[in-house]
């Protein structure tokens, strides 16, 4: 099993190109099942989760072709893919494939909407709480699907097609909004989604669906209206920049000191996180094609955050921000309101010398003068990258084990950091 070795203490300086967003690319790829025509996606990151979904789509009969990379990207980053679902051979998504990645469960929506049936295994993925699929299934049932659970599979059918309806989500759900958008796009009549997720990735999916011929209004607000159409066609669409990768590298610069330009990204994708980062004493400046992050001298000021749905502070940056706060000059309070059991990185940060106390959904971080390198173990995707950030600022060498988590969500991480001066190396098993 691969490991990453990091010798900390080197400020980061240079330029980091931001990849396409995994959390946008996944639903976009799944949307290829809605049409028999070709969907071409630009700026798709090269990640383990993308490869896993490609295998799942291939199992259904979707043809996949890599045709190039985004201009300015290196050989290990970014790709343009063409997906064609003209010969779907199977509407079953088996356990051995779906269990590798939770988002793959979303194939249930386009399969049901286009073919009237789907049999999809209950999902796997990051071990950060239950992440129930109840809200996704509720949305499909509201649209007229008949659903039963049989042997660990969700079996969904519709006799006469899906029907437009009103869906009021009891809590904000990104997955539920993705599923409802895809299903409603081919439903008869009008569907209204209330308390819909406002995340940029939802907007990106909606914009792609509109290019495919869907009639959608209100994406990016809490009320989305979808007028169903009889069929969707192919299109060409560029995946939006990864706001979580952007925030991750911004926090790494803040923690190590230095001056880095993050290019191919946008400030509006993570305004709340950047505002919080600026409050810690880090200089954050908008560039024409990205963001400049600088912290040269001076301590890290403590800051309190509460994770919230967009446009609030992202839960996917909580672990990284906690790593930054371990070196703040004072106490910080971090409250996690989105997912349960998302503090698994705490005990590993403690191995580096962090002082963190947990109280339910609250983490109280007492800043220390320095961290020291140690062997640590990644437990999930975001936790693993928080350990990378901590290790970059720690004295001595840190060995991070189980780094396959990183490969699920961060494209060419070692190469991007090394180009900015980080002493980082992957040791392959």
UniProtKB/Swiss-Prot annotation:
Pathway: Cell wall biogenesis; peptidoglycan biosynthesis. The modification 2-(S-cysteinyl)pyruvic acid O-phosphothioketal is found at residue 126. Keywords: Cell cycle, Cell division, Cell shape, Cell wall biogenesis/degradation, Cytoplasm, Peptidoglycan synthesis, Pyruvate, Transferase. Signal peptide: none annotated. GO terms for molecular function: UDP-N-acetylglucosamine 1-carboxyvinyltransferase activity. Pfam families: EPSP_synthase. The active site is at 126 (proton donor). Its EC number is 2.5.1.7. It catalyses: phosphoenolpyruvate + UDP-N-acetyl-alpha-D-glucosamine = UDP-N-acetyl-3-O-(1-carboxyvinyl)-alpha-D-glucosamine + phosphate. Gene3D superfamilies: Enolpyruvate transferase domain. UDP-N-acetyl-alpha-D-glucosamine binds at residues 102, 131-135, 316, 338. The keyword Cell wall biogenesis/degradation applies. Phosphoenolpyruvate binds at residues 22-23. It is found in: Cytoplasm. It comes from the Bacteria. The keyword Lyase does not apply. One of its GO terms (cellular component) is cytoplasm. GO terms for biological process: cell division; cell wall organization; peptidoglycan biosynthetic process; regulation of cell shape; UDP-N-acetylgalactosamine biosynthetic process. Belongs to the EPSP synthase family. MurA subfamily. Cell wall formation. Adds enolpyruvyl to UDP-N-acetylglucosamine. NCBIfam families: murA, PRK09369.1. This is UDP-N-acetylglucosamine 1-carboxyvinyltransferase. The gene is murA.
């Amino acid at each position: 099993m691969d490991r990453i070795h990091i010798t900390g203490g080197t400020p980061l300086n240079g330029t980091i190109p931001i990849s396409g967003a995994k959390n946008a690319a996944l639903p976009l790829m799944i949307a290829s099942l809605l049409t028999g025509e070709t969907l071409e996606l630009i700026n798709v990151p090269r990640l383990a989760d993308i490869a896993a979904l490609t295998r799942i789509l291939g199992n259904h009969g979707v043809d996949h072709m890599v045709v190039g990379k985004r201009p300015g990207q290196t050989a290990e980053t970014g790709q343009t893919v063409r997906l064609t679902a003209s010969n779907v051979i199977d509407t079953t998504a088996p356990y051995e494939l779906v269990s590798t990645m939770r988002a793959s469960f979303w194939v249930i929506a386009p399969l049901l909407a286009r073919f009237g049936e789907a049999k999809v295994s209950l999902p796997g993925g990051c071990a950060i709480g239950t992440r129930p699929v109840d809200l996704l299934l509720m949305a499909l049932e509201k649209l007229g699907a008949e659903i039963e659970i049989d042997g660990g599979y969700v079996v969904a059918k519709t006799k006469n097609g899906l029907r437009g309806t009103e869906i009021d989500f009891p809590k904000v759900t990104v997955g539920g909004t993705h599923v409802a958008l895809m299903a409603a796009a081919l439903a008869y009549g009008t569907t209204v989604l209330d308390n819909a997720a406002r995340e940029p990735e939802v907007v990106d999916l909606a914009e792609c669906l509109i290019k495919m011929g869907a009639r959608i209004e209100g994406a990016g607000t809490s009320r989305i209206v979808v007028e169903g159409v009889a069929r969707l066609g192919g299109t060409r669409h560029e995946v939006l920049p990864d706001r979580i990768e952007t925030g991750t590298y911004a926090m790494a610069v803040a923690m190590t000191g230095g001056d880095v330009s993050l290019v191919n990204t946008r400030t509006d994708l993570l305004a709340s996180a950047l505002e919080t980062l600026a409050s810690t004493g880090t200089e954050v400046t908008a560039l024409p094609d990205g963001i400049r992050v600088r912290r040269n001298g001076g301590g890290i000021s403590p800051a309190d955050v509460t994770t919230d749905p967009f446009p609030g502070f992202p839960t996917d940056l909580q672990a990284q921000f906690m790593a930054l706060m371990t070196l703040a000059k004072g106490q910080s309070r971090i409250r996690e309101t989105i997912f349960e059991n998302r503090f698994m990185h705490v005990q590993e940060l403690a191995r580096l010398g962090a002082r963190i106390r947990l109280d339910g959904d609250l983490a109280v971080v007492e800043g220390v003068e320095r961290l020291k390198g140690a062997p640590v173990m990644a437990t999930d995707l975001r936790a693993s990258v928080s350990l990378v950030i901590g290790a970059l600022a720690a004295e001595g060498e840190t060995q991070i084990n189980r780094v396959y988590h990183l490969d699920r969500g961060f494209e060419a991480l070692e190469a991007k950091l090394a180009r900015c001066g980080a002493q980082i190396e992957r040791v392959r098993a």
